[in-house]
Amino acid sequence: PPRSTLFPYTTLFRSLVYDSRKVTKDCMFVCIKGAAYDSHDHTEEIARAGAKVIVAERPVKVPEGVTLVLVEDSRYALSMLSAAYFDHPAQKLKVIGITGTKGKTTTTFMVKGILEHAGYKVGLIGTIETIIGDTHIPSSNTTPESYLVQKYFAQMVEAGCQICVMEVSSQGLMMHRTAGIPFEIGIFTNLAPDHIGPNEHASFEEYAACKGM
């Protein structure tokens, strides 16, 4: 795993947050550099809003009494922290990951249906929705941010699910949203020259490399 540096305080935190609009008192906040907003540039404001621990990829300003954790990759750190925060729920499930250029959604629902017919209780995370028991949550991304993935795993465990079938996008892999998940089975549907562009992958080679993670 990437190296990390902790200084200068050890602090208990109440919640894990990565969205600066959702900072809560005494939380651990993970700075993420996005396409249009980089929370590394707003750490003093985030600390004033209540964060007691700030995780960042580069040295940032924090007030006295706030713990700063420096990591090589904050998205990777968020994934590992989220798993720990929710008590590693994926270890209590059989997780099946499905990736590929085309067919992920169809395959995910097919596998879910087959397993349910065999008597298993199955959760699903995918492009259309996340399904946890009788609860259906509309999706914003094929593979949600790692914090949400782990939160959904925890809710599946609580709901009595034995298996989770999830779509795994190349963007999700590239951004470490699935880092640390102990996949029981991986299914690769196909690979085609798609998702190439300034907001996705720079080249087909990069796209293929992400699919192979």
Give the predicted meaning of each segment.
Residues 5, 71-74, 89, 204:
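Generic alpha-helical segment signature
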Residues 4, 69-70, 141, 199:
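Pocket-edge positions in alpha/beta enzyme catalytic cores
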Residues 8-80:
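N-terminal leader/targeting and accessory segments in enzymes
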Residues 2-3, 40, 63, 143:
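Short, conserved micro-motifs enriched in small and acidic residues
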